[in-house]
């Protein structure tokens, strides 16, 4: 699979949109372990950076972008423009919080402009 370009802007320098393929998305859902949640709760009492949560959210975003690229490639696109993130948290039961991140944008076929 060729690399899919993903940008947050709607235009790419030295390229033109040959065809708009359509909307694409990629979603990832993760949770911390019960021990991780407990340790995070203890750290929250004293304040400061929540490194475990930061790492989890960043990994979730990376997975969402990978899924976005796979979706775009499956439709024959070579780029995604206007990429954005949406995220949320929900309770999976028994106090287990799940972090959800969706990356979305518009799949296009870009051609180089000489």
Curated annotation (Swiss-Prot):
InterPro entries associated with the record: UPF0145_dom_sf (IPR035439), UPF0145_YbjQ-like (IPR002765)
The record's annotation in Pfam families points to: YbjQ_1 (PF01906)
Q: Which PANTHER family match?
A: UPF0145 PROTEIN SCO3412, UPF0145 PROTEIN YBJQ
Report the family membership.
Belongs to the UPF0145 family.
Name-wise, this protein is: UPF0145 protein Acry_1752
């Amino acid at each position: 699979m060729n690399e899919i370009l993903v940008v947050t802007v709607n235009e790419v320098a030295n390229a033109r949109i040959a065809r708009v393929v359509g909307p694409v998305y990629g979603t990832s859902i993760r949770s911390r372990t019960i021990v991780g949640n407990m340790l995070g709760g203890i750290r929250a009492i004293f304040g400061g950076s929540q490194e475990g949560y930061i790492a989890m959210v960043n990994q979730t975003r990376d997975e969402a972008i990978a899924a976005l690229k796979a979706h775009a490639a499956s439709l024959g696109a070579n780029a995604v423009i206007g990429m954005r993130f949406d995220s949320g948290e929900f309770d999976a039961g028994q106090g287990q919080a799940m972090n959800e991140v969706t990356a979305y944008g518009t799949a296009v076929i870009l051609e180089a402009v000489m």
